[in-house]
């Protein structure tokens, strides 16, 4: 994998960044495009060679296994690829950096238990933190500029974050923070200011003393990725966060993490992504598609596109199936089907969030056969008032959103759509949907082209 990964991505996705797809791409049945996307996503294959971390010095007895795991990964990579096997037991480790052609495989009852010491997450690495590029702590499992990489098996990744470690950096009392303790806010504001002013990446250095939490899994500028079968718990921040990646499969994972910003799976400026048969139980959005934040996201200019999500289950979280708020590079061609969402602690089922600083286009988004039990606020929320709200010069373009055979048993609102007068939400279609036990009328601020076909709310047909 050469160092011109971004050039490759920009060349391959210029149509997504610079303009909408031609109408000919979208057939009468848009779901044929979803089938075409799935057909071309190919999980990586690996030679049948195993590299057991025990043979490289790892011990499931509390011994630090960081170096042993790194030696096994290097040997596997040097041999041309294979599986680095984590056998049964609990293995203490600092961040793990994957290399090309390596499948890190956790057998059932294997646990990777990650260090709580921030110093172990140095040296600084390239990352995107809340949609802005910088140099910061490594993710717990990290890769940059690699291809043919995987994280598989029935084992568990334990992030070891709690209200005494990592989560207090959020700066909220319900996350263990108290007045007088440091938190992320000064560094977060500084990073966003650097992004707005085009400060060179090499000068955007954070890490020690800045309190910007790492993610659990972050693969950057890489391709041909598989994450399958594993369970993830208690991440410092996002659980799965591919950034500027292509040909990504996330399958059969289980995520349980109720800390701040512990999103389940957040593809950021990624293309050709399949997420299926996963279970999300989180402290933030279960699944959020992103594409960079504000000016920095527009500078990078790579959309998230050609994403299929199916057969997933969402429990607790702020949003079940979410796009944004970091979406300045654009999000398009998203297909969601046969998913279940249900929890009194799930706020929004289908959630879009942006504002007048983000800009960006969200278009060609399709939901079908989505079953929602109980949700706290709204079945469909499109919110232009998120965070900065109207305090900015940009005009988000959000439209061409379609719901078919979506049902809900209980929610405060069916629709909560808040656009801008200068940039209305447009072209939203609901077909054959049933929403029961809805408590309040729809909120429709600056919406154009809303069409409801055979939609029932509390047993009554709505037009």
How would you describe each model-predicted region?
Residues 2-463:
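Extracellular/periplasmic carbohydrate-active domains that bind, remodel
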